[in-house]
Amino acid sequence: MSRALDRLAINQYGKLRFAKEFIFQKNADINVSNENRIWFLDAPAYGNLGDQAIAYAIREFCRKVLPDMEIVEFQEDKVIQYLSWLKGTIKAEDIIVLQGGGNLGNLYPRYEFVRRTVIKSFPHNRVIVFPQSVYFSNDRTGKQEAAAARESYAANKNLVIFARDSCSFREMEKEFPETHIELCPDIVFSLNGIVSVEKRSGIGV
């Protein structure tokens, strides 16, 4: 079954992969403030230390730059099943942040599907994708997925994607002409001292 899914376009893959979550939506049993909030909507749900370090750096950066805003975090494998609740809870003034790293493109279809879904679902919110590298395979599938990503990203005029290297920056500018692209080093470079990937505070699912 997984091999068959892997051959599908990312949008088809995601709808099948998360079919149960789309049908059986859940309400999050958490209390969030009425103040403006930062929603980290695709925190990694797996143990890769590099990606966990990036997630930690994102939290610390948000706390430092916007200390008065509450951070609410959902892991990437939980977003779809809480999507209806999120749509009813996230305010237009809230900021949505998405994971940095190297999962933008068609190499990691589950992550790309979740990212596209979030970006399209909140067209009026500022959405910030932290520094990413991009990869679309140099074949028909890669071209199709680049076009699908282009359409999804263009649906949100408040989207900003940060590229973490010059090659990715040029590629993103070419593939996503309607999206605001900026060049910025990997967010882990914003950390000082030793990174503890275990540290996590605030509200999360």
Regions picked out by a protein language model, each given a short descriptive name:
Residues 2-156, 171-173, 188-189, 193-194, ...:
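Aromatic- and Gly/Pro-rich donor/ligand-binding loops
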Residues 41, 159, 183:
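Metal-ion/cofactor- or nucleotide/acyl-coenzyme-handling active-site neighborhoods
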Residues 50, 158-165:
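A short beta-strand/loop micro-motif in the catalytic core of glycosyltransferases
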Residues 169-187:
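Helix-loop-beta element that forms the nucleotide-linked donor phosphate-binding surface
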